Amino acid sequence: MTKPIVAIVGRPNVGKSTIFNRVVGERVSIVEDTPGVTRDRIYSSGEWLTHDFNIIDTGGIEIGDAPFQTQIRAQAEVAIDEADVIIFMVNVREGLTQSDEMVAQMLYKSKKPVVLAVNKVDNPEMRNEIYDFYSLGFGDPYPISGSHGLGLGDLLDAVVKHFKEEEPDPYDDDTIRLSIIGRPNVGKSSLVNAILGEDRVIVSNVAGTTRDAVDTEYSYDDQDYVLIDTAGMRKKGKVYENTEKYSVLRALKAIERSNVILIVIDAEQGIIEQDKRVAGYAHEEGKAIVIVVNKWDTVDKETNTMKKFKDEVRKEFQFLDYAEIAFVSAKEKQRLRTLFPYIKEASENHKKRVQSSTLNEVVTDAISMNPTPTDKGRRLNVFYATQVAIEPPTFIVFVNDVELMHFSYKRYLENQIRAAFGFEGTPVHIIARKRN
């Protein structure tokens, strides 16, 4: 299921970031950072009534030759292209400007639903000054005050009315939904073509469940797969290549619809910060993951070359220590068959359930080997553990005091559960909950 995307667009200094922070609230502050994940704040999750959505903050668009204006405008165009609904923000204090009218022209061309928000209406008297904005042609303007939080409810009511009904998933539960993600030029398109051209792969293109996405169904060794949004992976264009922050929104949609993610890195260039950022999206969505080192044919090899590279991957992607690593050459079609067992294993483990009785035996043994921590004379007591979800496997551990469950001990319990049950290829979530 994909969450709708809402983009906040407008000229500089109309209060876009303030509204963004108001909508996402505490979600922007990270309670427990995952080590090694680079966080990118241009998008976050929002929630209104029963609706979950992703919301994007964009740079200010204006007329003239301001620094970076060409890039900012290009980024905004990508955000508009990927958005399902657009909040067009203007500022009542400065009135209607030429830059507002230029942004309006961009939005007309997009043919997307637009909700017009007039910000900085900080007192009732200022409501009389919003009428000029009707001339923009987007219907009723919504008066809001980002600094005081006024009018946001009415604005969000108008936004969620434009959300479309989620289309039913057309694929069987047994079909593995697969996405290939990575920064530009690591060989994603080549890998798509190589997989679909592999012996014993039977291919058929189908319309995806999201706008302008094309999925590709194929089967290999009696397992059905669907490669999510192959058109998006093959989508070219300098705007998308040069606006990585915003073009990643397309990858987000594909990630949300997938069970298993192939994260592609370039063996020639090694691992850079952007690789970790892209991987962080998939990890935070709780997806099963396989790391694919592409262009392996270009690397000069000695006896331990693969081991050294694998050690480097483990060091840089510490938060993906559960993911298997495959070394391939999409261009030369080398070692592709090593991928399929990893994908299948990751998918099966992503859906794995364990019996509560066996789970509690493992937890009891873990505590006997490494007693629970204490803080100011109080010891953590673990009463019971149970699995509450799959995709990813999620466990609740009932304790006497949640504050006593340190991150390090939670990590220890996860490692013991992994040692007992496997779970290669999938994240495992452990939630501490106070026993009533």
Curated annotation (Swiss-Prot):
CDD domains, A to Z: EngA1 (cd01894), EngA2 (cd01895)
Residues covered by the KH-like domain: 352-436
Domain of life from the UniProt record: Bacteria
Keyword field contains RNA-binding: no
Annotated residues for binding of GTP 1: 10-17, 57-61, 119-122
Residues reported to bind GTP 2: 182-189, 229-233, 294-297
Gene3D superfamilies associated with the record: 3.30.300.20, P-loop containing nucleotide triphosphate hydrolases
Single annotated GO MF: GTP binding
UniProt KW keywords: GTP-binding, Nucleotide-binding, Repeat, Ribosome biogenesis
A Pfam family matched in the record: MMR_HSR1
Family per similarity comment: Belongs to the TRAFAC class TrmE-Era-EngA-EngB-Septin-like GTPase superfamily. EngA (Der) GTPase family.
Function statement: GTPase that plays an essential role in the late steps of ribosome biogenesis.
Protein name: GTPase Der
Gene for this chain: der
